Amino acid sequence: MEEFENKLIIDGNIFYYIDLKKIISIYPKLKKLPNTLKLLLENSIRNTDKSFHSQIIDSFINKNHEFDIKLIPDRLLLEDLDGIPILCDFASMRDFLKNNNLNETKLTPKIFIDLIVDHSLEVESVSTKYSCNNNLKNEISSNYERYKFLKWASKTFENLNIVPPGFGVGNQINLEYLTTIVCIKEINDKKYIVPEFIAGTDSHITMANAMGVNTINISSIDALALMLGEGISIQIPKVLGVRISGELDDFVNDYDLVMNLTNFLKEKKSSCKFIEFYGEGIKKLSLESRATISNMANEFNADIAYFSVDKQTINYAQKTRDVDVHFIKEYYELQDLINDENENLEYDEILDFDLNLVKSCIVGPKDPYSKVLLDKVASKLESFKRGNILRDNDIVLASINSCLSTANPFLMIQAALLAKNAIENGLDINPNIKASFTPGSKTVEKYLRQLNLLKYFEKLGFNISGYGCGVCYGNSGSLYPTIESEIENYKLNVSSVSSGNRNFSNTLHPLIKSNWLMSPALVIAYSLKGTVNFNIKADVISKDIYLKDIWPTNEQVLEYVQLINFKHFSTSYYSLFTGDSHWLEINEVNDTTYSWNDKSTTIQPFWEIYENQYYDKINFNNGRIVSVLKDNILCENIISFSIPKKDSLTFQYFNELGFHIDNFKNIERMKSNKFLLKKRLFDNENIQNILCSKVGAYSKEIESNNDINFTDCVEIYKKSNVPIILFAGKNFGSLKNSDAVAKVFKLIGVNVLIFESIDEDFRKNLVKMGILPLKLENDSISSLSLTGVEFVNIFAEDLSVNKLIEIEIIQSGIVNKVKVRILFKTINEIIYYKNGGFLSYLLKNVV
């Protein structure tokens, strides 16, 4: 590392850094590397042995997208839905160490962690001045056990900060306060300046890309690895350069921009996973405007949506954090990473996007990609049934929410001024609508109150109902009772309007099929009418008032933006890690290990997934097939966190505990409950085990030839030390929950998965859990004609990457030899597998 080292003296203090200019002077072809890749190069060089440096640099020069680079983030950002299960896993590792007569207190996170409790706010109380406090009080009461565990973790583990509920959304808090852009790290007794690199479990962590910070969305398994001091590996990504030109028209705002851009990028179907924005047009975009764009990277299939550091970045850091930013500016200038236009950099692909062509729109009704221009909405509607007090397309839920829009002062003030104009014209929202306002931080409430604008939200019923994800994540609470009855009785297709980034059918509320995304100002405007079935640009809203009569000009909005006292951005966070009185009342437990409750529905240890064995070869004899699945099985169907049906095994489990599932809208909060996850496995009407006649969580009991509960069948084999094998067709295990599925497969004792093809993230998670992934080389599920009575023998020595072997499938004494490929893609994966999985390896070799 010293060969590329340089030093910077600030106020008499010596700081070292990896000098990208020095590297580029030796390897000039790197000069045109996109800035986001230069940041990856710096991290990889800094965290890799010198003997690998030339190989790393050559791979960047030659754009070797198959080459794995090792990265070590500086900080881990967790939300509570994934963060609590991760901490439960970490706590259970302490149990594992203690049970093996090792010092459990040595196990503490090796990376700085900020865990923000933001996904558990249930928006039940709305439209009163007490709503915020009532919802917070109810949240802490209903999540008491989860939060008690968090308080224990914060007292027990070093490097862990907990942001209690009631402060906002993690991504917005990160943008406004936590992100530092550069970090100081101790390396070999030297102080190093490094560009901040953040890993996190929320898919919208990319919001920090707007500040020139690289981020990576990771699985819970990778998060645990980081906590144990291990890095993460990614292949050098392709980078799409998006050249921005022009500027937005007066009626168009940043929300319109990001939805137009999302639609544009989805249609282009680029293969690049990193996006870097540049061009003259970005000079017209505020930092908050860029953050609105970066937030949606996941929706346009990108891992990063990056803006290089420039004057906007430096100014935003200075005004929101009240810190001396010369340190940041000097570092990025030294590294040649401040670049307003990036015209001379080489991208794998380039697309042009003209801001002048952006049109005001809404998005929906069932995905965040389908842009609809305002004058075309009515023509996109499909059903027009009537009830007694409602019709199809009537709005029953309106929410100003999400870090996507509430982190943008322009959008917030625009909505406030529209509300003001509506009130002054005698307008009000439709009384059938449940309205709520859940900002992503307390900063929003402070500057709206300072500008005397909050009262206009409140007068229309958009009182602040809490600070968190709320409706955006589906925690919308109940609709008004008469409204719910009306929808169910007449089977109506009603609508929600919100300023978030999620709108798949039934995700915001189980009774709402059509969910429309739009800017906060349009949320209010549509709520004044009470339906989406009209042309909001041309038709009367009410009382001869049109949208143009109440829509504020950009100049009017910007006048207010200039008046914001940005000290609110630092003062709002003074008690960020302390919490309010509700949080402080939660009992604290002081012990080196956690006292688990076997009957808990939310907090359970997973120590059973760790092994203290070593396997030098693969040797499975007389394995039994417990499931044969068709093509395109999704992980979110294998383990679903939707409300279970009353005839499901999950519902029966809760009944046995005396737990009323009807009162618990989001069982995803129970991700740490190993018993629930086992019951939830395959408990879905979209899953059909080919071996069985019944749909869902069933397997074939061979002796009786009856369908029995899947986990019961697996348990029988596990107790007898019989290898447990699953077969699947093409495209097995895509979409979310793949880490949870891999963990539960390990927990119940699955040894081998054999498939035609598999999702890559799922494959990686299986290997990390010590489960053998085998790809059928020439055969298919249909050609094998499996019945479940077969025995399977699998043997392999001298394991290597993508090794081809033959397995034996035996039925009635007849041996069918089938070629399969062991899908280990790196030497490290083989090492992890031999140790019983990634986490077991780390426990044995790192801890």
Residue map of PLM features:
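Long, structured ligand/cofactor-binding scaffold of large enzymes
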Residues: 49-243, 258, 358-371, 375-462, ...
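Extended C-terminal subregions enriched in glycine
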Residues: 428-477, 734-736, 740-743, 750-774, ...
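Extracellular/luminal Protease-associated
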Residues: 274, 278-285, 501, 713-758
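Acidic/polar, glycine-rich intrinsically disordered N-terminal extensions of enzymes
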Residues: 1-72, 86, 583-584, 591-596, ...
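Mobile "lid/hinge" segments at catalytic clefts and subdomain interfaces of large enzymes
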Residues: 190-325, 329, 413-434, 463-570
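Terminal amphipathic helices with adjacent charged low-complexity linkers/tails
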Residues: 72, 90-145, 276-379, 537-591, ...
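Acidic, glycine-rich flexible loop/linker segments
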Residues: 543-552, 762-832
